[in-house]
Design a protein with these regions (language model features):
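Blade-loop segments of beta-propeller domains
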Residues: 27, 31-34, 52-102
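Asp-box/WD-like beta-propeller blade repeats and closely related beta-sheet repeat scaffolds
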Residues: 79-173, 187-195
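Short, conserved, GDST-rich strand-edge loop motifs in beta-rich repeat architectures
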Residues: 49-61, 100-110, 159-171, 215-237, ...
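Loop/turn-rich, solvent-exposed surfaces of beta-rich toroidal or solenoidal domains
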Residues: 265, 270-290, 296-301, 311-360
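Blade-terminus and WD-like Trp-Asp/Gly-His loop motifs, strongest in beta-propeller folds
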Residues: 35-44, 49, 88-101, 142, ...
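Conserved blade-ending motifs and adjacent loop-strand segments that build the rim/top face
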Residues: 254-263, 312-326, 358-386
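Blade-level signature of beta-propeller repeat domains, shared across WD40, Kelch, NHL, RCC1
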Residues: 378-410
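A short helix->beta-strand "capping" segment at the edge of beta-propeller domains
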Residues: 9-29, 362-365
Length: 410
């Protein structure tokens, strides 16, 4: 871990400290900001080497997930060595890591293996293997999404992927839910529009809500017979839903799809609450806002026009909302987000989320400029430790993508 006071400017608040966590000559990255990759005590997290902000190459032997121990000055310890390791999730108790081994091929299938290992590298075991067409699926599973999500009770792990037969364009994608105690898997969602699901379990301890998953539906997308995208989204854009992890109780969130506002494709639960948050882009006025809402009964794909929708623009007190990737702490009280200008290296902002769901964030604090080139493979993707005391981000300001940490406000 290397101190980086040169990344702090006169505009940064007093006491801010920036550290570069990775320093290798090959790209290193944090996991996508919505992933559950922190221990609940905020002491250890997972990141990866020979990687980028949206995943890694499953055939890259240099790719590894690492445990970063903040109590030991950011000491890194490899936690995976297998080829094709992907989609990590730390259990809510913080004792074990779940991850997948991707040995699949579109149209052919292969093996998708759910594994578990203690964070000290011991007791590694296979939990479940998918090596044939899952009942109800249109084809073999392949192209696993580089993120998984784990339920608040640690009993279920979900991941999405491609279900094409290798000969049909615009074939279905689907969402798998693995039941850890029984070592079984179920296909709970399937269709051509579920190509970029971003599944995220609700972290609420409420028995019913703990089965809920935020899922993203990309309308108007196109892909070839191998699942490669020719168009990620079309028409009025994506909309965001919530579904129970048995595939029932589909609900809507009132965002986007009105011809002016669109969902960027970044959303999350606000901490362990049942409130949800997304970043939107508007044509007029040209802004990128942070809008919270709660779910509504499913009536279709109406977006913000969904009847009964109640929205709260958390970013309305910011003088120039231009927000994209964001995350909250575990309690849903603190938020970190990146912002434009993209051609100026971007910016990191911090704010406090009101408990009153009608109020906006009022204490916006500019932290720093990450110095990012803001290409897809260098996205900043900021997130917070569970206790909200420290933030994390990616940057290629050195010429090579690296992982960073910023703190000093608490």
């Amino acid at each position: 871990m290397r101190e980086r006071p040169d990344l702090i400017s006169d505009q940064s608040p007093g006491g801010i400290e920036v550290h570069q966590l990775t320093t290798e000559s090959i790209p290193s990255s944090h996991i996508y900001m919505e992933a559950q990759i922190f221990t609940p005590d905020s002491r250890r997290l997972i990141l990866h080497r020979s990687a980028h902000p949206h995943g890694s190459n499953p055939e890259d032997p240099a790719h590894q997930y690492l445990v970063c121990d903040l109590d030991k000055a950011g000491q890194m310890s490899p936690i995976t060595t297998e080829l094709g390791a992907t989609a990590p999730s730390i259990a809510p108790q913080g004792d074990v890591l779940y991850y997948f081994i991707n040995a699949t091929e579109p149209g052919v299938g292969g093996r998708l293996t759910l594994k578990r290992v203690r964070l000290d590298g011991t007791s590694r075991e296979e939990i479940c293997v998918v090596d044939e067409i899952i009942p109800g699926a249109s084809g073999p599973f392949s192209r696993p999404y580089p993120l998984s999500t784990i339920s608040a009770d640690g009993q279920r792990v979900a991941i999405s992927g491609f279900l094409g037969d290798g000969s049909t364009a615009n074939a279905p994608w689907g969402l798998l839910v693995f039941d850890v105690p029984s070592a079984t898997v179920e296909l709970v969602l399937q269709g051509a529009s579920w190509c970029n699901v971003h599944p995220q379990y609700c972290r609420s301890q409420d028995p019913s809500a703990s089965h809920d998953l935020i899922v993203q539906e990309n309308h108007g997308n196109d892909c070839d017979a191998t699942g490669a995208f020719t168009k990620l989204i079309g028409g009025a854009g994506a909309d965001i839903h919530v579904i129970a992890d048995d595939g029932t109780n589909l609900r809507d969130l009132p965002w986007g799809r009105d011809g002016n506002e669109s969902c960027q494709g970044h959303q999350c639960w606000i901490g362990d609450t049942q409130r949800a948050l997304t970043s939107t882009s508007k044509r007029e006025p040209k802004v990128a806002e942070l809008i919270e809402a709660r779910t509504l009964p499913h009536i279709g794909h109406e977006g913000l026009k969904t009847p009964g929708g109640v929205r709260n623009n958390l970013s309305r007190e910011h003088p120039a909302p231009d927000f994209h990737h964001f995350a909250t702490d575990a309690a849903g009280r603190r938020l970190i987000t990146d912002a434009g200008p993209r051609d100026g290296g971007g910016a990191l902002w911090l704010g406090t989320i009101p408990t009153d769901e009608t109020k906006a964030i009022e204490d916006w604090t500019y932290l720093m400029c990450p110095g990012s080139s803001w290409q897809k493979n260098t996205h900043i993707h900021p997130f917070l430790s569970p206790d909200g005391r420290v933030g994390f981000f990616n940057s290629d300001e050195s010429g090579v993508l690296q992982s960073y940490m910023v703190g000093g406000w608490a």
